[in-house]
């Protein structure tokens, strides 16, 4: 058996900040090549790499305390190393922010998932990470066919949700809502798919906007510590990710996700800002048309559509940052291989 790249495992070595991590590589007996570029960044290259090969980024840990995705990725990497997991796609596995993970917090100085646009940002530990990740994405996707590029950025939600798992499709200038991507969501038994209506500054948006990748931010359950995640609830997702890496069609039946459009983004404009509900309210809690659910300065925050629902409410964001998304359920269809709605 080939010597492992890791002292313990991809995840354990990434989080062990007492040990240095050196760039190194190995080739397995099946011809699959593993290249550890830096702490938390592993490239896996199939034996038969070609122009037809998918190029897939599977990222986790953009928020340090969202650990379920790290555990899922770690198990896949382990099974690749042992030869149990077939590899036909070129993959980049990322555990992004081990310092925050070890501190059991989302971030140290700045929300990393707000730093992937081209705006000027204040210096921070997270800005250094964002800049490194941008370079890694560029290097990974350079000289690859556009249609081969995928990016699944895996997260967990802070609060409970009426949908235990959901995915967000970023809004870009490119055709990044393919039927293949939606089929992946449905086979993963992800309960809801949100279609963003404006550009953002997230990691998945960056890959979709600048590299035309089929990209999603995927929210998997709630934040928990390593070893305390309900990974059995993500069996369908795990199988579907593994099938994607092996480039085979899933054998299990899909479950169509409920599709939502983002109707608007609530941005905090004033110091005097609050919601009328407590922090226990679930994502996708809906309101009647005209129902007031908060205020921003002297302006009431109210539902502008019947059954308009709130996602990611956060009363504590800084002025100028997103305080919530408002979403409405839609009937979607495919047009020229792209998911659209009327």
UniProtKB/Swiss-Prot annotation:
Gene3D superfamilies: Zn peptidases. GO terms for molecular function: hydrolase activity, acting on ester bonds; succinylglutamate desuccinylase activity; zinc ion binding. Its cofactor is Zn(2+). It comes from the Bacteria. It catalyses: N-succinyl-L-glutamate + H2O = L-glutamate + succinate. NCBIfam families: PRK05324.1. HAMAP family: Arg_catab_AstE. This is Succinylglutamate desuccinylase. It comes from Vibrio vulnificus (strain CMCP6).
């Amino acid at each position: 058996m080939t010597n492992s790249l890791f002292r313990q495992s991809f995840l354990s070595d990434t989080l062990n900040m007492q040990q240095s991590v050196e760039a190194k590589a190995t080739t397995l007996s099946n011809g699959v090549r593993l290249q550890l570029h830096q702490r938390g960044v592993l490239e896996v290259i199939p034996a038969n790499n070609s122009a037809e090969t998918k190029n897939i980024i599977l990222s986790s840990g953009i928020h340090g305390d969202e650990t379920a995705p790290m555990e899922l990725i770690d198990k896949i990497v382990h099974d690749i190393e042992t030869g149990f997991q077939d590899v036909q796609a070129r993959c980049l596995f990322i555990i992004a922010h081990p310092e925050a993970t070890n501190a059991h917090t989302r971030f140290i100085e700045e929300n990393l998932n707000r730093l992937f646009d081209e705006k000027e940002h204040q210096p921070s530990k997270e800005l250094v990470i964002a800049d490194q990740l941008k370079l890694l994405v560029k290097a990974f996707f350079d000289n690859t066919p556009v249609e081969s590029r995928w990016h699944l950025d895996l997260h967990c939600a802070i609060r409970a949700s009426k949908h235990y798992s959901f995915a967000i499709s970023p809004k870009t200038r490119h055709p990044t809502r393919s039927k293949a991507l939606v089929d992946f969501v449905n086979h993963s038994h992800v309960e809801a798919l949100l279609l963003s209506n404006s550009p953002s500054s997230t990691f998945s948006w960056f890959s979709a906007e600048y590299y035309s990748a089929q990209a999603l931010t995927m929210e998997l359950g709630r934040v928990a510590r390593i070893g305390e995640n309900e990974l059995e609830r993500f069996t369908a997702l795990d199988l579907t990710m593994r099938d994607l890496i092996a480039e085979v069609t899933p054998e299990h039946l899909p479950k169509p996700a409920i599709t939502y459009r983002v109707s608007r983004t609530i941005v905090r404009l004033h110091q005097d800002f609050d919601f009328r509900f407590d922090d226990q309210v679930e994502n996708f809690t809906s309101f009647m048309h005209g129902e007031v659910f908060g205020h921003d300065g002297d302006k009431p925050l109210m539902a502008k559509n019947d059954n308009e629902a709130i996602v990611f409410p956060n009363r504590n964001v800084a002025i100028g940052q997103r305080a919530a998304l408002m979403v409405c359920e839609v009937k979607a269809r495919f047009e020229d291989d792209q998911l659209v709605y009327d």
